[in-house]
Structure formats: structure tokens, C-alpha cells
């Protein structure tokens, strides 16, 4: 899983598989492997939107103090319990690719009440990004007909221990993140080595990745998220036709 401004969720398999519902894709990696998965538009870009539009004053203070604005963002989110007290965010601020494939999709908060504050909106937004990615994961499981026991993630989001644990809980799966957060370049180098015959297989990656951070799902939090994910999916389905009307 990669978390740049957009986000990718993929798995490597030995035989090609097709999603007849058109939610995810499958393509050749090499002579013996295929990649299956899907990209979403709304990953790290949601954090940037929160930073620039919701937390502008806090960000200015953070800059003066020499603090990473994204650390401030996730710390504010950590003040709120998992589930953001019933607030759900659909993160479709830039339309959406997998699994909706709908350029007209729009973002929304659902469940907003007078008791919700800025920190609830931030937590709900972070959770919403992962809820959406989880729907890609569900499609992947359906097509592969198996459930991975571990997810390996990389990208800017991986710097946040709070968001990493959030992902482990929402996906109810062990999460491993390399300390070298930006691993796309490393992966490209390894593919190049394999292509020119310098290595026989991809097992060398384990040594090259180095130290990793591991997170296990919290059983109580998993139960909360499983209920909210159902609501997230149901809402998205119920308003799909309205996206084109408001776009």
C-alpha cells in the first residue's frame, strides 16, 4: 500500500485474476507474477486539504515553532475516540477511481451534530480515507478469494504512528511499515535488477528494507470500525446518483 497524495492498494499474485465488476485491475509484473489492486484519488491530498483549509492557524503556529504541521494534524485527531463519535467523512474531494470509478463523486460529512468540534472532523477525515481504501481491500479479497494476514504500507502517511494504528484497526490486519517510509524507488530498483538478471527473485527486498514498525489491530477498536464501515458503504451507495446532479 502506498500513501502519496493519491493512494494505491495492491497485491502480487502468481496467476492473473479479473474483477468482472470492474472495481480493480490486474497487470503483468514479470513472467511469473501479476499485480492486482486499485488506485484511489483521495489519500494524502486529504491531509493537505485539512492542513490548508481547516487548520490554517494551527499550521502557522507549528511553522513558527519548527513543528511538522502534519504531526499537529494527527495529534489533534488523537484527542477524539475511534469512530469520531459517529461522524463519517466520504473523502471524494477529487472524484474517485477505485472502487467507484466516478469522476463526479463528491466529499461529505455525515452525522454532524452541535457536539462535534474541529478535532472530530479531522479524525473523521483520516478515518474516511481509510474506510474508502478498505472498500478497495474488500474487492481485492473477493477477487483473490483469500484474505491477507499482513499489510505492508509505505509513503508519507507511514510517518504517523496514530494513522498506522488506525489502519491496522480498520483493516483488522497486522500492519508492517518500513522505517524508510518512501520505498517506491527501492521497489523500482529491485525490479530493474531482476530484469537485467542481477538477482534471481525478489527475496532480497526483505534485507534491503531494513527495520520495520509493526502494528496489530485492537479488538475493541476493530468492532467499532466494522460497524462504521458498513454505514460508510451504505451511504456511498445510496447517494451515488446524486453525485452527477451536484457535480
Feature names for model-found ranges:
Residues 1-8:
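Short, small-residue-biased leader/transition segments that mark boundaries at the very start
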Residues 9-247:
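Active-site core segments that coordinate phosphate-bearing ligands/cofactors
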